[in-house]
């Protein structure tokens, strides 16, 4: 909708009324830096400007869908194509292109614009053979791509530093280009803003993306894809025969980038994983030289922990048997009895070095807990 926020009880998660000015007060403040003196007066300042025109974001949706079925329902499915344009998206004051000398936090404003498009495909197959076996297959695929059209970026920023023109949650990273092989490479490399004196042969050669001779936050560039997959796939296949049934479900994603390293629950890295392929002067390894607690710049890891987050997971398999109506079930007062054996998260095909479920977040700190593999043996009884 596009209803203006006019009710005083409508608040946002930071607990502030975005359409009201925020006042701060204090006293006994030192005035000036020469012969300072306290003032006995209480002062008031506007710490955040309100915006009385705050409203809900709006969306314009365009969809085209087709449902189909053939051969008496043996082949069925659907095709959906969509195109959305969202406008008036709320932009935080800290994300706005406001000069530092403005004097206070900029107000929230409905400035953002995002477009997205894609399609959804579904195919269902169902057939019963002459010998009584019923087999079925359900598959689906979703392709969704979004792009930030406007985000109130500073107009003089290079395009690669802007949010506009890129996907939501686009990965930004320092880019590494091989290793610093010799001391000459170290001396001739761009300056790190932190820990430059700690650079050694074997460290990553970080690309000075903007060419100013310094490695800083302005050298973080778009890398690979967003942390949200562009494509998702789902397939379920099963069969039934004389009370027996078997079922398997696969799930996969691609065109996604994820961060994976190996912290323990106390945020300490596992050395065997982190340094198992460390750099040596012959240049045979792909990782940097190991260190003994030396503080180095945050840029030093480059793209080391960013991986192609594509995977195909065997998410669930189940084998079951449902007892047919029999006298012994009736004698026990049981209408239906089914026994089953199933397993979850049985296998995953991926280029990532570890099994991290995507819904735990894209970063390693969110996904440090491993995906659990489970097996269940049970019985369902209906009285």
Sequence positions of predicted segments:
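Transmembrane beta-strands of outer-membrane beta-barrel pores
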Residues: 2, 81-87, 125-127, 141-147, ...
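Transmembrane beta-barrel strands of outer-membrane/channel proteins
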Residues: 1-3, 7-11, 15-23, 77-83, ...
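Conserved small-residue
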Residues: 4-17, 21-23, 109, 126-227, ...
